Amino acid sequence: MVEEYYKADYDILAMTDHGVITNGWTSERETNGIFNKFRKVYPMSEENYERITKGLDRGGRGMTDIRGGIECNMAVISKTHVNGYFTTYGQGEWGIENDYRTAPVEIEKAGGYSVLNHVGDWVDSGRFPHRSHWNVYIAYFAGIFIDCPSCLGMEIVNNTDRVTRGDRDLWDELLQVVIPKGRNIWAFADDDSEKLNEVGRSFEFFVLPENNEANVKKAMKD
């Protein structure tokens, strides 16, 4: 998967597997039994890691490895998924149904950042766009962002945008609530790729003085 993103010309990559923390592409990872279909995870070789992170075969333009990545609430039917970055929380946690709040709170305690994933999947605004304007959802998500400064934002595009097509409207509604309180909400666009043919559907641009993990972390927040 990492190789596929490198071939697709990406410059930054965070691996956020369901309930599995990735502490670097060369590190061993513990998957979650039957939920992960007992898959064997093969760490990247040091040779390939150097080639990709230094861009040895694409003109010196390496791809940065973002560590501490995970998708929390891995097993919930309601799909209240939350991405964690630079975190130690979430390994093997099955999650709580209909709950977007617990993961950001716990990720903040662990010193990481979080992003709310495809909230339209839960709100069902892909099919019913007017739900993005319902006060019950606006108040719920605004409360999370106000209470958790390390919850940086929300996806407004996920994969092919089928479930997030109404999330731009919800994002706009939320900004009107939180900005007067001194808070911003960044918008994210993620592949949510679980298969190689899903690579390259969504991406973000980062303004960086130099492409490295520390600068990416700062840019995500600032």
Regions found by a protein language model. Give the residues of each.
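Charged catalytic cores and adjacent phosphate/nucleic-acid-binding surfaces used
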Residues: 1, 77-88, 129-222
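A metal-dependent hydrolase metal-coordination microenvironment
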Residues: 1-129, 156-171, 190-193
